[in-house]
Structures are given as structure tokens and as C-alpha cells.
């Protein structure tokens, strides 16, 4: 029952994992396609699996520091074992005393518990200030007090065994594994061999191995000298103490081989000393490791930007450093709550931010929607390697091909150059020689140009320059306004009074009416004159016809 409860995933974590898994099943995802983005100076450098975790699982390792020798070889190894025992006691007694002081500082009474805890931490660690990590370590130590007491109750049987690793379950609230790195050595060298060894050789072998282990112990507990019992032990330190037997505990706690290397690199597996018994030379360590929920189909995609050439100078794309994609939705991923390893992200919570339509369109492959910020710095990265090939800004640096010999030129208006083994086998960039082995296939877009409208100002110096230009424009406008005001001041104010304006309006209306009447009268006179002309013309024609008729008669 104890081991089962120690490995249970908390309800909030289970709910988060189930919701995320349900979403991932509905919306299968693929990693962001970086092929259309590379020529625009946006490089997809890799993906990592996203996991959510909580540090909820604990188990105990009981390190058996003093090995049991075979009966027929005890006399030969007596001298080095006694010296080793004395050194162990000298080295670890301060640690044991500190553990006991902290555990005994908390009584069963209710009042002032936190104050006594802080006081014990400061007194035990000989520090002026108790850090949050030390308080956490001391709290874990106090919570493990009962388990440590149960282990001490079994110390005689643990010390008497000749097994290098075995599980201890009697009366313990959590999984405990007793391991003995030195016992493993004794078993391998003396108990499982039929070869007869002389006493001198036994003494030498035991002495050398014990000295090596003492060196490892000193390395592991070096930080404990300045802050006894309050410094966490790393997974590497735990392996030094327990040897390969550490895997037994991790396997029992549910850590698979496929997760082990990634978890070791994350630093999430830690240990805290909870007991030291100088009589039996037993060292108890409580191991804390995370409960991990794998979010299927959720991956973090890492983006890097390259300085590209534009008509406004060199510029870098404005895109998030890390994005995650589920289905057709792409959002920025906040990794401040995550611990990174080579292949995984372990996050206590998943926090994403929506992106603007422009950035979303850009990362979807529409490079004309990408926005860029001017980067005039001489140290801005002008090239980047990608899958055995190189993406370089050959206007910012000289791209020299050594095989075949020549200079790789970048076309006018082209943002960057995509260089692979088809165009160059050996490339030299700023004195760095690279042998290319990859190829950019036809799916990679090339010859992308950045328009002026895509380059904006974001840097502090550039913004200051633009503000200066705006201030100059405002000053010029103020000068024009002042000139206009001076001209207005010359205008007679009396002529612009209300009564004068009314008079001007009335006179204007009268003038317009008179003009219209004059126009109508002129039109009437013209019409009347034309009518008279037509009448006279008709009379003349009629008289002429009568005269012609009379002449004929």
C-alpha cells in the first residue's frame, strides 16, 4: 500500500494529462514545415517532445557503506576495513549530527513549528540566511523522519546481509532498496571465485577499492561540509554511491529505460540524506523523482532567425523562439516553466500565447506576411548550418567555395543563399571551413525577396532615430503654423466682425440676384431680336416673290 500511494499521480496532473491527450487525439499534429521559411531567414532547428510532470514519487536508498567479508578472509582485510571505518565515521558524523538536529527540532506541539524549523536550518547549516532550497530540503528531511526511524529499526538485518541489492519493505511507508557498492565488489572478487588469493593481495585489493570509494564519498558530500544535510544530491552522485544498483530502485518506481537517460539529463531526479548510522555504516537517502505525463502529438518546435538582406539593410525576422502546433493551430510556447533536455521538455504547466494573424500566416509558409526588424550589428549571425547544408547571408559575409574554387554570390534582392553539396563541397565562412553533405531539395523555396513594407523599426536606437525624425517634422510644422499666424495677425479684425460678415453676405446675395436678372433680360432681348430678324426676312422674301410674278406677266 505504501509503495502504491507513493507513485500515484495527483488529480490535477491526471486531469491536465487526460485533457491534453484527448485534444491530441482529436487534432493530430505534425512539426512545423521549415522548408518554405529557410530562404526567408527563419530556420527550424529541431523538435522536442512536451511532457508535464510533478515531483510526487519518492523512494529510499539505504547505502551499505561497510561490506561484509567472507569468514576466511576477514583477518586479511581487517586492517584496511578498520581504517576505512574510522575515515567514514570522521567524514559522515557531522552529516548525521545535522540530520538528527533538524529532525529533533520539530516537536509534536502545534505552536511555533515554522520558527523552530527555520532556526534549526540556520543553526544546522551555519548560515546567516536560510534559502528556499534549504527550507525545502529540511522540510523533506522532517517528513522522512518516520521512514528513517523504521529503517534504523531494521539496520542490523540490513548490515548483516551479503546481498548487494535487496528490497526492504517491512514497516516502511515507501519503497526502500538497500544497496552496497562495496558489497558488490567483495562478492565479485572473493565470494564468487574459486581462485585462492594470498592475504597480501586481498589486503591490497580491498584497500585500493575502499580508498577509491572514499574519494567518491568525499566528492559526493563535498557541498555537505559547508551546508550539512541541506544540499540535494544529484543523480550522478546517487550513481556514485550506489553504482549500477541505482537502476533497481528507479525501475521499481516506474522509470522505463526509454525515459531514464532523458530524466537523468533533466536533473529532476534528486536525493536528500535522511539518516546516517555510524555503528552499522548505513546511509539513508530519500530519492525524489517526477511523475511524468507524456502529451502525445504535442511537440515544441525551436526557431532561429538569420540576418537577411533587404533594401533597407540587414534585418531579422520577428518570430517566437519556440512554438507548438496542434492540428492547424500554432501558438507560442512559454518554456520558463519547463526543463529542457536534448529530446524532451518537462513542464510543470503548459502556457501558450496566441500569435498575430501576420506571424501565423508567416509560419504557415506565407513569407510575404513575415515582418523583420533592422539589425545593423556586426556580430549578428550571418550563417547557420542545417542538416549538412548552410544557409548564409553572402552579402554580409564572404562565402568562399574551396571545392570547387570560387566565390558564391548572392543575387540582388535575395534574402539569403541556400548552399548545399550540389553547389559546393567545402565552404569557408569567416575562416571557418565546413564540408557539406546535405542537399536542399526542390521543396525548399529559394530566391525570396523581402519588401520594404516588411521591415519595421524595433530597436531602441532605431526608435530614437525615428522619434528624432518625427520631432523634426513637428518642428517644421510648428514653423509653418507660426508663419501662418503672423500672416493672420496682419488681417483687419474689424473686417471680420459679425455685422460686417452679414453685410457682405447680403450684398453678395443682391449681386447674385441682379446678375441673374440681367442674364434673364439679356436672353429675352436676344430672343426678341432674333424674332424680328425672322419677320423682316419673311417680308423681304414675300415682296421679292410678288415682284418676280409681276415681271413675268
Curated annotation (Swiss-Prot):
What InterPro entries does this protein's entry cite?
Answer: Fusion_F0_Paramyxovir
Where do the TM regions start and end? 501-521
Function, as annotated, reads: Class I viral fusion protein. Under the current model, the protein has at least 3 conformational states: pre-fusion native state, pre-hairpin intermediate state, and post-fusion hairpin state. During viral and plasma cell membrane fusion, the heptad repeat (HR) regions assume a trimer-of-hairpins structure, positioning the fusion peptide in close proximity to the C-terminal region of the ectodomain. The formation of this structure appears to drive apposition and subsequent fusion of viral and plasma cell membranes.
Annotated GO biological process? fusion of virus membrane with host plasma membrane; symbiont entry into host cell
List the disulfide bonds in this chain.
Answer: 76-199, 338-347, 362-370, 394-399
Protein name from the UniProt record: Fusion glycoprotein F0
According to the record, the signal peptide region is 1-31
Lipid sites, type S-palmitoyl cysteine: 523
Gene name on record?
Answer: F
Organism, scientific name? Newcastle disease virus (strain Chicken/Northern Ireland/Ulster/67)
Which SUPFAM superfamilies does this chain map to?
Head and neck region of the ectodomain of NDV fusion glycoprotein (SSF69922), Virus ectodomain (SSF58069)
Identify the residue position(s) of the site Cleavage: 116-117
Q: How does it assemble?
A: Homotrimer of disulfide-linked F1-F2.
Amino acid at each position: 500500500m505504501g509503495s502504491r500511494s507513493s507513485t500515484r499521480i495527483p488529480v490535477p496532473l491526471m486531469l491536465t494529462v487526460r485533457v491534453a491527450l484527448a485534444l491530441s487525439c482529436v487534432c493530430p499534429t505534425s512539426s512545423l514545415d521549415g522548408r518554405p521559411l529557410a530562404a526567408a531567414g527563419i530556420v527550424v532547428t529541431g523538435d522536442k517532445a512536451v511532457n508535464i510532470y510533478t515531483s510526487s514519487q519518492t523512494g529510499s536508498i539505504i547505502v551499505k557503506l561497510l561490506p561484509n567479508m567472507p569468514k576466511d578472509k576477514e583477518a586479511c582485510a581487517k586492517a584496511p576495513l578498520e581504517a576505512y571505518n574510522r575515515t567514514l565515521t570522521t567524514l559522515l558524523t557531522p552529516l548525521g549530527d545535522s540530520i538528527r538536529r533538524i529532525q529533533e527540532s520539530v516537536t509534536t506541539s502545534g505552536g511555533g513549528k515554522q520558527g523552530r524549523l527555520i532556526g534549526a536550518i540556520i543553526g544546522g547549516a551555519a548560515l546567516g540566511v536560510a534559502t528556499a532550497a534549504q527550507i525545502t530540503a529540511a522540510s523533506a528531511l522532517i517528513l522522512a523522519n518516520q521512514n528513517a526511524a523504521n529503517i534504523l529499526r531494521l539496520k542490523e538485518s540490513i548490515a548483516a546481509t551479503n546481498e548487494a541489492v535487496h528490497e526492504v519493505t517491512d514497516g516502511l511507508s515507501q519503497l526502500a532498496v538497500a544497496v552496497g557498492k562495496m558489497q558488490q565488489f567483495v562478492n565479485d572478487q572473493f565470494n564468487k571465485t574459486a581462485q585462492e588469493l594470498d592475504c597480501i593481495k586481498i589486503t591490497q585489493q580491498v584497500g585500493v577499492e575502499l580508498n577509491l570509494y572514499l574519494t567518491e564519498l568525499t566528492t559526493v558530500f563535498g557541498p555537505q561540509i559547508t551546508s550539512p544535510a541541506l544540499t540535494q544530491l544529484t543523480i550522478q552522485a546517487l550513481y556514485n554511491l550506489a553504482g549500477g544498483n541505482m537502476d533497481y530502485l528507479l525501475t521499481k518506481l516506474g522509470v522505463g529505460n526509454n525515459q531514464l537517460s532523458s530524466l537523468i539529463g533533466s536533473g529532476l531526479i534528486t536525493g536528500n540524506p535522511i539518516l546516517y548510522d555510524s555503528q552499522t555504516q548505513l546511509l539513508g537517502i530519500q530519492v525524489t523523482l517526477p511523475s511524468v505525463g507524456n502529451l502525445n502529438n504535442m511537440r515544441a518546435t525551436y526557431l532561429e532567425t538569420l540576418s537577411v538582406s533587404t533594401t533597407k539593410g540587414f534585418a531579422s525576422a520577428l518570430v517566437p523562439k519556440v512554438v507548438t502546433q496542434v492540428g492547424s493551430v500554432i501558438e507560442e510556447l512559454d518554456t520558463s516553466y519547463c526543463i529542457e533536455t536534448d529530446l524532451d521538455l518537462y513542464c510543470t504547466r503548459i502556457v501558450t500565447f496566441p500569435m498575430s494573424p501576420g506571424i501565423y500566416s508567416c509560419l504557415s509558409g506565407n513569407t510575404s506576411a513575415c515582418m523583420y526588424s533592422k539589425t545593423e550589428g556586426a556580430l549578428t549571425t550571418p550563417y547557420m548550418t542545417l542538416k549538412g547544408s548552410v544557409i548564409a547571408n553572402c552579402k554580409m559575409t564572404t562565402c568562399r567555395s574551396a571545392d570547387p574554387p570560387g566565390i558564391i554570390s548572392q543575387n540582388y534582392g535575395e534574402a539569403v543563399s541556400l548552399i548545399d553539396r550540389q553547389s559546393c563541397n567545402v565552404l569557408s565562412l569567416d575562416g571557418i571551413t565546413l564540408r557539406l553533405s546535405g542537399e536542399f531539395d526542390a521543396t525548399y523555396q529559394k530566391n525570396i525577396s523581402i519588401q520594404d513594407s516588411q521591415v519595421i523599426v524595433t530597436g531602441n536606437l532605431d526608435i530614437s532615430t525615428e522619434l528624432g525624425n518625427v520631432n523634426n517634422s513637428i518642428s517644421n510644422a510648428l514653423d509653418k503654423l507660426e508663419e501662418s499666424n503672423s500672416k493672420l495677425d496682419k488681417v483687419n479684425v474689424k473686417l471680420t466682425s459679425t455685422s460686417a460678415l452679414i453685410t457682405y453676405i447680403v450684398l453678395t446675395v443682391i449681386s447674385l440676384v441682379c446678375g441673374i436678372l440681367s442674364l434673364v433680360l439679356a436672353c429675352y432681348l436676344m430672343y426678341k431680336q432674333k424674332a424680328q430678324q425672322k419677320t423682316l426676312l419673311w417680308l423681304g422674301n414675300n415682296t421679292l416673290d410678288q415682284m418676280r410674278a409681276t415681271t413675268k406677266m
